[in-house]
Amino acid sequence: MATAATEEPFPFHGLLPKKETGAAAFLCRYPEYDGRGVLIAVLDTGVDPGAPGMQVTTDGKPKIIDIIDTTGSGDVNTATVVEPKDGEIVGLSGRVLKIPVTWTNPSGRYHIGIKNGYDFYPKALKERIQKERKEKIWDPVHRAALAEACRKQEEFDVANNCPSQANKLIKEELHSQVELLNSFEKKYSDPGPVYDCLVWFDGETWRACIDSSEDGDLSKSTVLRNYKEAQEYGSFGAAEMLNYSVNIYDDGNLLSIVTSGGAHGTHVASIAAGHFPEEPERNGVAPGAQILSIKIGDTRLSTMETGTGLIRAMIEVINHKCDLVNYSYGEATHWPNSGRICEVINEAVWKHNIIYVSSAGNNGPCLSTVGCPGGTTSSVIGVGAYVSPDMMVAEYSLREKLPANQYTWSSRGPSADGALGVSVSAPGGAIASVPNWTLRGTQLMNGTSMSSPNACGGIALVLSGLKANDVNYTVHSVRRALENTAVKADNIEVFAQGHGIIQVDKAYDYLVQNTSFANKLGFTVTVGTNRGIYLRDPVQVAAPSDHGVGIEPVFPENTENSEKISLQLHLALTSNSSWVQCPSHLELMNQCRHVNIRVDPRGLREGLHYTEVCGYDIASPNAGPLFRVPITAVIAAKVNESTHYDLALTDVHFKPGQIRRHFIEVPEGATWAEVTVCSCSSEVSAKFVLHAVQLVKQRAYRSHEFYKFCSLPEKGTLTEAFPVLGGKAIEFCIARWWASLSDVNIDYTVSFHGIVCTAPQLNIHSSEGINRFDVQSSLKYEDLAPCITLKSWVQTLRPLSAKTKPLGSRDVLPNNRQLYEMILTYNFHQPKSGEVTPSCPLLCELLYESEFDSQLWIIFDQNKRQMGSGDAYPHQYSLKLEKGDYTIRLQIRHEQISDLERLKDLPFIVSHRLSNTLSLDIHENHSLALLGKKKSSNLTLPPKYNQPFFVTSLPDDKIPKGAGPGCYLTGSLTLSKTELGKKADVIPVHYYLISPPTKTKNGSKDKEKDSEKEKDLKEEFTEALRDLKIQWMTKLDSSDIYNELKETYPNYLPLYVARLHQLDAEKERMKRLNEIVEAANAVISHIDQTALAVYIAMKTDPRPDAAIIKNDMDKQKSTLVDALCRKGCALADHLLQAQDQDGAVSSDSEGREEEGESTLDSLTETFWETTKWTDLFDNKVLTFAYKHALVNKMYGRGLKFATKLVEEKPTKENWKNCIQLMKLLGWTHCASFTENWLPIMYPPDYCVF
């Protein structure tokens, strides 16, 4: 047996399938039509130029002609211009950069910028490098430092059982070092590499260099030109294996570092056009084709596509005169075939003859799950994913071959407006090249992302042959050839495979044989505002319906007017279904003609029905239809009271990959459904997909979708629940996973439940005190346990500024149509650490269908550090923020300034997740709610029975800090008592806040005011004049006022405090340290420390004016601590200054030593005195404690205080103090990592969009 297996040839043809599409047969017939002369734009995560198979074409040309990042995620602001001194410049990282003498720069001017590597590293690479850096750079050194610190601590503890006061500090020092090292390990965070970037003009072209070694020696780094000039690229190192190229824009002021954002794009390009000269069996479908790599997946958004990236990409596609676009991306859209992005795609296709191929989506098996643009845009060829028996053996190593099938997850049509959705299908899996940074040569991936480039490569073969033979073609003729020659698989439904599996050889023959002008035309089919007839809801199929269908020819761009005039098509219209009636003929000229089609679905059985009305040119009927009118009708099953609103099926047989669809008319009043699946098989476990979709006009299918992939064990049972909309048809689909082996039998039931609330969203205004809502059990007896939970509070922001300007050279559409941006700036305060979700309500949830080009927000802290970003789908971009102030910059782009100006006051919201959820009390009648008595618990509602509930307001002490008028809380209302009902039937709740209650004033202040009233006016004037002079004393650089007031008010403490603050805040502070000490002593001497200590020791104060006394004593203590700390800081600075001057020759060195000893004694005394009154980690004391530790060279204690200072005030200067202490302690690894954080935490400006 083993010998037989090893002798069997390896099925290489199944690794990257070409046989199924006729590509292999075509290349056997025409080996030179292998894609030569064809340029494919791959709009994806970017293509790695160093990946296997991405170097050359079959005729020796560069495989990748250009690599472009249109997202902006790799952009570096290089507007800062410097000139070297002595061959060196200081980069924005702070590193000294050595300019090699071999560089040519006639102007001597360099544009510099900085970029954090983790900003553009792919997520998987970032995670790998973080792990490797910790294991190789951090862990070995840190473990040794921690072991040494523990050893010293242990030795000291053994030698000093009863330490003195001085030894206590040494013990604390050693303990601090151990504590800090442990803390650094817990808080370890890798900033990643930080690269200095240089751009300059060498007299002929722009060049760029990135300091990838991070040591400033630029001779080690690669100098690059724009990739298109010489196909140059560099690599960030042997560990990363991340290849990169550059593009330079705006006269050197902007550098784009282009890397792949993921493995997806390289895999796609390898399928379409990979070429392996030594291993031709590994070739892509069109190895002779060239690639234009355009990165449209924004690394900042986890490679999500953006409007900016897509529109810039289409500009590049047009400018490079591409023949084909492969786009293996897409999202669900609220309305098909519409929006700015789709408009730009349509323009590229119809005006520039660019064939646009895209994935249909991976959201099946339910119908109408095609994504945008692949399955919803008229100009795009949407490709479904097919799996063949050879693929099952070669790629998936299945034990046995199964019949060819569509992947379970491949999206199905029709689109919401009736178009077929899926145009054609192609193999949806491959083992192909991936980027080098993955450390793999190849990888198995599947999806319509893989079927699209397979089809695209096949089309490239066709175009290669047509170009070689000078056969003219249009996007319309190529699409018609593909659809009319595709092979339909009998066991696969039309909505999954479209017109069938593409056949490259037959499509080529079709185009060579059918060269008439009519075949080069496109045809726009419209049914009102739709592109087909789609009858799905019960009301639509209850009676016959007439539909006016418009058919209009679409001419290729630059068609002569004479040809438009001469167009006269004699068309035959056919339908093969008895339930559809249409005219038999149509005369079509250069205008939109309308015909009437009648659809009568009354006699159709329950389920799904599809047919087409096809239009044939009677001059060449064998060429197939010129256009099709797709017609879909769904006849839904009904469930009613007699069946307990259940649909039950027993002992249902499932083969591998088999799908069973059930269309059900959801009963009016139903709000959720429960599905229960039971296995009847005792020997086979089975994988199933449970999928349900309801369509609502102008809502994407995902808005009312349920999806569950489950593994059902032998004789196992599972139950799931999902929300439904009453009165509309729902498709419930249960599908056996495509790769499952053996047959299986199951029972399953779909049961409907209904608890209807009067409002689809509950809006509660706290000002009303009590809010009512009513509930009805619509279908059957239901157990209720109403519960309202609030999980977030929402802050509404208005822009502080709105600035509009034209964008750069990358943002000009054909015919010099300039694009513009508006940047809106918002500020908000985060009251405490927590998770936030920013969003723009007007534009969010809109991407392809949006009328604006794009939206992108970036959030910054007060130091302009980028904290996070997001775009159209806010739920994907939640982030955790610490307490502080933040700025949000929102970019919106459009071609018309007037449309942008309308948004200059656009509101923006920030949703703050509550650390603890809040609940509202619910009562069954108004009186109970008014008195705050018995809350509603559990009750059972009979069918059709109505029950009111009353909600009371949230107590004021529960309102989150920072929330106020204009803010609201969000959460949900659940009504069902069952866990399944709670999970599925959820009603959104908004709770609107009002102003908080006015707090009563402090009684002590009132008493103070009363005592002030008793003073006569002259006394008041004298005191006011005194206080005014004290106020101005601190602003004037003079001692005159102080001396004057000291004579008049020798015992007035605030005067001495003001003098101390005046001296301590002066620019010449270091020259007046002795005066500061004297001023501090004056303050201290005017405080009765004994009386203060006695008061603090009191447990209670029974005196009637206790509040006033407490206030006065608190002020005295605060003043005393402040004076001690300022005195201590002045003494410490004096000693640190002297330490810096050690070694200097001086005649009075002995006198200085005595003075230093005296100052040190005074410092020590002040330190211990301070500890009597407060904790060393008090905010006021931290600076003094830090400086005291420095004087005593106790760097561990110093670093502990310095890190606390950073927490309180995270300035760059405070961080530099920490770094200095880390170096003094010998912890260079900590210092190095912290130094790399500085340019990230304190960038010179906001990052570019």
UniProtKB/Swiss-Prot annotation:
Modification Phosphoserine occurs at: S915
UniProt-listed GO biological process terms: proteolysis
Record Pfam families: Peptidase_S8 (PF00082), TPPII (PF12580), TPPII_C (PF12583), TPPII_GBD (PF21316), TPPII_Ig-like-1 (PF21223)
Residues covered by the Peptidase S8 domain: 9-508
Example of a GO MF term: tripeptidyl-peptidase activity
Organism superkingdom: Eukaryota
Active site: D44, H264, S449
Annotated family: Belongs to the peptidase S8 family.
Note: The limitation of proteolytic products to tripeptides is achieved by tailoring the size of the substrate-binding cleft: the two negatively charged residues Glu-305 and Glu-331 that are blocking position P4 limit the number of residues that can be accommodated in the binding cleft and thus create a molecular ruler. At the same time, they orient substrates so that the tripeptides are removed exclusively from the N-terminus.
The protein's name in its UniProt record: Tripeptidyl-peptidase 2
Gene source species: Bos taurus
Record lineage: Eukaryota, Metazoa, Chordata, Craniata, Vertebrata
